[in-house]
Amino acid sequence: GGSWEGSAGDGNTASLQLRLLCRRALADSMDSDDILAVTRAGLDHYHKHYGYTFPWGSYDQIFVPEYNLGAMENPGCITFNENYLSRDTPSFALRQKRANTILHEMCHMWFGDLVTPAWWENLWLKESFAENQGTTTAAEATIYTGEWASFAIGRKAWALAQDQYPTTHPIVADIPDIPAAKNNFDG
């Protein structure tokens, strides 16, 4: 782990322990230096741009096996699929993809956890904003300056393909219950 200290335009200061956790068999694959560099850069960037101090008392990142999501934000703790770790030296592309995911989920600490849409029909708002912010922050605040090119050939191309399928749906949909919310969640 490590630590981070910073402040935002609201005049408050945060002092956080940054913890990285995974199962023991992958401890040597953690790539802590890169993950912590991205984490610190993201915290600095979001504090500067949002003007609101990190609202939670800790910041943990946990890499878990057999996780059916890429990652998930929880107040002060993000869980990631352990596939973001590599037993070999991680490629630049893997590290860049991981950085985007770290920054996307970190954005949710402010826009998703601190401020949350009232109901699932507005899921698109928090997800599209976090997608934009993860890409923007990676490109502006980390060594992954080519992140917008990766977005264009990866995420944008995927979205355009999804829109051609008969299963496509409006961005804002009627979501009467939780199962409908799950069916409306893309990517």
Description of each model-found segment:
Residues 63-65, 82, 113, 127, ...:
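Active-site proximal loops enriched in glycine and acidic residues that flank catalytic Cys/His/Asp
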Residues 71, 127-187:
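Acidic/His/Gly-enriched intrinsically disordered linker/tail segments
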Residues 102, 106-111, 129, 133:
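Active-site His/Glu-centered metal-binding helix of metallohydrolases
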